[in-house]
C-alpha cells in the first residue's frame, strides 16, 4: 500500500484535503471513496484499517476531511449535511478527472447516510456500503438534544463531542429537517451493503432495519456483532473492510488479471515508466517485486535478493517439518530467519567486472517443541539438505535467449 496526499476544491471553492491509498502494485482495478462520521476525520484508525483491507484486494481508497474538519478549509459552524453530500460529489469529480471515476462509496455513521444521498448523484457509483449509519440525518441531533432550546433561542450553541467543542447553528438543524433518507434509498437502485453492530448504543440497530426495508434488492446486511459504533477494536474494522471488499467485487467490474502469460514457471514484467516496480506471476500466484527506496525503488515489494532469501527460508522450514513428521518428533513450530550480506548496489556497479565476491546467506533456525540435543543437531544437518540449499551450492547453468513477445494463446493460463 502507498499513500498520496491530495487536495481538491469543494462546491464553494474551499480546499479539502485527503489521502489516496493505492494497492501495492499501483494499479487499482477500482476506486472507492470513504465518508467519515459526524465530527470525525479521515485519520480515524478504523477508517485506515478498512482502507488497508480494500487496498489489499486491489482497490484504491480516497478518504478525506469534510469541510471544516481536520486539514480541510472552512468553518465547521457554517457546514451542514448537504455540504457533506456536495463534498462527496466533489471528491468523485476529482477522482474522475485525475485518476478514474469511483465505483464504490463507503460511509460510516452520518457519513454513511451522506454516502447514500451522494450515490444518487454520482453516476459512476456501482455499489454503496454503510457502517452504523442512521436511517435519517435528523438522528444526529440526539447528540446535542439538551442544547436544542438554546439553538432555537440564539440560533447556535457550542456542544462538546468526543472532548472537542463544536458550534452548531440553526441552519444545520434546518438542513437535516429537509432530508428524507427512505425515499432516497427507495429510488437509489444500486447494490447496498449495510453493516451495523447490534450493540451500537450511538446509532441503534433499528436504523439498519429501516434502511434495509426501504432499499430494493440487491441489498445485504452484515451484523458487526460485539463492535462499538466507532469500530475501535482493530479486528472489527479489519473484518468490515474484508467484508466490503468481498461483497463489492460482485458488483464492480474487475478486469481479469491475465496480462502476465507464460509457458514457464515464473514471469516478471516491467514497464518503462514503472521504475523497479515489477509485476510477477509465479505459478498461479501474482505478486510485486521492487527495490528499497535507498536503491531507487519504491519498496512496494520484496527485492530480488529478498526473494532469493525467501526461497531458502521457505524450502528449509518445509524440509525440516517434512523430516520431523516422518520421524514423529514433536516440533510445533519451525522458523528460519535468513539474511543475504552482499550489497545489491555494489553488485550492479561491478556486475560486468567483478565476479569474485562470495555470496553469503546467514540462516538462523528456531525450533519450538520437545526435542533433545541429538535431535536438534540432526535437524541442523537436515537443513543443509533443503533442495534450494543444494541448488545454491551446485554448479548451475542459466540458458538465456531472446524470443518474440509471448503469445497468450500458447499460455497454460
Predicted features, each with a name:
Residues 1-26:
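N-terminal cap/lid segment of alpha/beta-hydrolase-fold proteins
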Residues 39-51, 206:
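The serine-hydrolase catalytic nucleophile loop
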Residues 46, 78-98:
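Alpha/beta-hydrolase active-site loop
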Residues 51-73:
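Conserved alpha/beta-hydrolase
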Residues 123-171:
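Hydrolase active-site cap/lid region
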Residues 188, 194-196, 200:
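Short beta-strand/loop motif that positions the catalytic acidic residue
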Residues 201-207:
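Conserved alpha/beta-hydrolase "acid-adjacent" motif
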Residues 236-242, 246-310, 321-413:
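Extended beta-strand/beta-hairpin segments
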Amino acid at each position: 500500500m502507498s499513500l498520496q496526499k491530495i487536495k481538491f476544491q469543494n462546491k464553494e471553492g474551499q480546499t479539502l484535503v485527503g489521502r489516496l491509498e493505492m494497492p501495492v502494485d499501483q494499479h487499482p482495478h477500482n476506486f472507492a471513496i470513504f465518508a467519515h462520521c459526524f465530527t470525525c476525520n479521515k485519520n480515524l484508525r478504523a477508517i485506515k484499517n478498512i482502507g488497508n483491507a480494500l487496498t489489499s484486494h486491489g482497490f484504491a481508497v480516497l478518504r478525506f476531511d469534510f469541510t471544516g474538519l481536520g486539514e480541510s478549509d472552512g468553518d465547521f459552524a457554517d457546514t451542514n449535511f448537504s455540504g457533506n453530500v456536495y463534498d462527496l460529489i466533489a471528491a468523485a469529480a476529482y477522482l474522475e478527472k485525475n485518476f478514474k471515476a469511483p465505483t464504490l462509496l463507503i460511509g460510516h455513521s452520518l457519513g454513511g447516510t451522506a454516502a447514500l444521498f451522494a450515490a444518487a448523484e454520482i453516476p459512476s457509483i456501482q455499489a454503496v456500503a454503510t457502517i452504523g449509519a442512521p436511517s435519517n440525518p435528523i438522528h444526529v441531533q440526539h447528540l446535542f438534544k439538551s442544547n436544542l432550546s438554546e439553538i432555537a433561542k440564539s440560533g447556535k450553541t457550542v456542544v462538546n463531542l468526543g472532548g472537542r467543542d463544536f458550534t452548531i447553528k440553526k441552519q444545520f438543524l434546518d438542513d437535516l429537517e429537509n432530508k428524507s433518507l427512505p425515499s432516497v434509498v427507495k429510488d437509489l437502485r444500486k447494490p447496498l451493503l449495510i453493516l451495523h453492530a447490534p450493540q451500537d448504543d450511538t446509532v441503534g440497530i433499528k436504523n439498519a432495519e429501516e434502511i434495509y426495508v426501504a432499499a430494493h434488492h440487491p441489498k445485504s446486511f452484515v451484523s458487526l456483532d460485539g463492535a462499538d459504533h466507532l469500530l475501535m477494536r482493530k479486528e472489527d474494522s479489519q473484518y468490515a473492510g474484508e467484508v466490503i471488499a468481498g461483497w463489492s467485487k460482485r458488483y464492480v467490474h474487475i478486469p481479469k488479471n491475465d496480462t502476465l502469460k507464460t509457458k514457464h514457471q515464473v514471469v516478471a514484467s516491467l514497464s518503462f515508466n514503472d521504475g523497479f516496480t515489477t509485476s510477477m506471476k509465479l505459478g498461479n500466484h501474482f505478486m510485486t517485486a521492487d527495490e528499497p527506496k535507498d536503491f531507487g525503488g519504491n519498496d512496494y515489494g520484496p527485492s530480488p535478493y529478498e526473494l532469493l532469501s525467501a526461497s531458502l527460508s521457505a524450502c528449509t522450514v518445509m524440509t525440516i517439518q517434512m523430516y520431523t513428521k516422518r520421524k514423529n518428533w514433536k516440533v510445533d513450530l519451525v522458523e528460519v530467519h535468513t539474511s543475504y550480506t552482499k550489497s545489491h548496489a555494489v553488485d550492479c556497479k561491478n556486475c560486468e567486472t567483478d565476479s569474485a565476491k562470495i555470496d553469503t546467506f546467514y540462516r538462523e533456525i528456531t525450533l519450538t517443541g520437545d526435542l533433545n540435543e541429538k535431535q536438534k543437531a540432526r535437524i541442523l544437518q537436515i537443513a543443509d539438505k533443503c533442495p534450494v540449499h543444494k541448488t545454491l551450492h551446485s554448479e548451475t547453468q542459466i540458458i538465456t535467449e531472446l524470443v518474440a513477445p509471448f503469445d497468450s494463446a500458447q499460455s497454460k493460463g
